From Swiss-Prot:
The gene is uvrC. Interacts with UvrB in an incision complex. It holds the Pfam family GIY-YIG. This is UvrABC system protein C. Residues 13-92 form the GIY-YIG domain. GO terms for cellular component: cytoplasm; excinuclease repair complex. GO terms for molecular function: DNA binding; excinuclease ABC activity. Residues 204-239 form the UVR domain. The UvrABC repair system catalyzes the recognition and processing of DNA lesions. UvrC both incises the 5' and 3' sides of the lesion. The N-terminal half is responsible for the 3' incision and the C-terminal half is responsible for the 5' incision. Belongs to the UvrC family. InterPro entries: GIY-YIG_endonuc (IPR000305), GIY-YIG_endonuc_sf (IPR035901), GIY-YIG_UvrC_Cho (IPR047296), RuvA_2-like (IPR010994), UVR_dom_sf (IPR036876), UvrABC_protein_C (IPR050066), UvrC (IPR004791), UvrC_RNase_H_dom (IPR001162).
Amino acid sequence: MSYDPKKIDLFPTLPGVYLMKNEEGEVLYVGKAKNLRQRVKQYFVPGRDGRLMIPYLVAKINYIETIVVTSEKEALLLENNLIKQHKPRYNALLKDDKSYIALKISQNDAWATVRLVRYKGTPEPDGLYFGPYTSAQAARQTLDLLNRLFPLRQCSDQEFARRTRPCLLYQMKRCVGPCTQKCTKGEYQQHLDRTIKFLRGQNKDVLKDLYEEMRLLSEQLEFEKANHLLRTIRYIEKTIESQYVDRPLGHDADAIGLFRYGEHVVVVLMIFRGGKLVGSRHFEFDNIIEEDHELLTSFLLQHYEGATEIPSEILLPSKISDEHPVEEILSARREQKVNLQIPQRGEKKALIEIAQKNAEALFKTQKDEATLREKTLLEMQELLFLTNYPTRIECFDNSNIAGSEPVSSMVAFTDGLKDSKRYRTYRLKIGSKPDDYAAMYEVLTRRYKRAKEENDMPDLVVVDGGKGQLNIAIKVFEELNITGVDLLGLAKEAGRHDKGMTAEQVFTCYQKEPILLKANSPILFLLQKIRDEAHRVAISFHRKRRSKKTLKSALDDIPGIGPAKRKTLLTHFGSLKKIELAADAELREVKGISAANIEAIRTFFQGRKE
């Protein structure tokens, strides 16, 4: 039943948020308005709103909920929270499943270090983060530079606790030796403060500090230390000079570009820190009914809520209606003023144009790649006589060594791309005797018995192997009474066991002889990619299983360490090597480990060395 627009006449004329829901109660869209009645009415006036997706949205609306607030700022915050909570299909929602790289300075360490870390979504609030960087290489280059300039410790906490004399880095003047009290807390903090300033682009402040310290050392006749500082100063000045070429800004800023094609939107974020372009990120949105100014507002609130840093200036491609409330919210999060600007000329305008061109180029590239993938899948359907268009493909591979720890993997590809959320690994229950057919029978039965119950069938199933493995798949599907799923077996050409792009045989259910695909076939390339991914996942899982078994076997030999304590130790430390290197104080932190157990652990590892 469609929504009756007459109900809107009862809506308040106050600012607030509205939630459009379908018959099942699913939230389809969340919006905000200065005047709820006036804004919601616009959706139901024919031709009033020209956005293509509006008729589709309106046709699905069964109920509209409104929430009145006291200000535009409150409406913005509530809208952002409701979008994150309900994940409406027609709103722009940032996904947090990507992994990002940053430099982290822990705030919990007495002697803090700079570490390269990866995180998803919002990072842990236990340190200062600098980034994200576009690549691990860029982050490592920055970390290497910091290690050359500022002598902070680089060792692990375990190594730091065990040190009785300084390491080689101390002799090289790359560390001030806090592990053996070669410096005071105040001296170490001074180096840490300079590191933070440098990462924030406050190079002039760092140089000023270093020049002042060098002057004091010279007055105290500490010429060797003063000379070392001078070398550091020259290195920083040289680094700064080399960066002027690609430093269009003199401060922290982000430049945002946006490209829209119908209801598909690409947003590009160019990140400048200390005036230098340190990276860029892109975000894609589909089925978006929000106008550009609404999408930009939503993007700003979502992105900078979980960002490691908020710059002092954000450059936008177009005006947003909620500019001042958004500035207030971002300034409160940063605890310093944040300016939103729409540049009209000069260098800043040029940066926005570059971001816009990047967004457009990215969209066109992805569109071309999507077209090629679709063409390959259509050719696969035709050439391999598939009943279904292979939107979702699942592939299986088994792994064992002489029957030990047999496992299987299942990988999934959707529209020709990895769909890692659907990956599965299986510990097999077959006996110790190697039997690839029994392994394939077990894993296929387990997977598709459940898939049938959950109505979660793929379009195509690929098994790694020839006619024999395909026959196992056919048998399983017949026993489970499953129809409508295509089955293929993939095997190298008879007599060929080499790696790489070689001709392969594809076995189908419809003909006795295999189909031979040429080495340069895009269909073969995709099938090999899927099969190799299944093999990689199976091998990785098998190694993990064997590693755990080896760890358990090794710890079995320690007197007084039973199954419960063994499991606790492995859970706490993660590896045999870390248990061996752990200090007594760290071992005492493990629940249930006594002084006698620690002595037994020490004796055990000492015996292994001898």
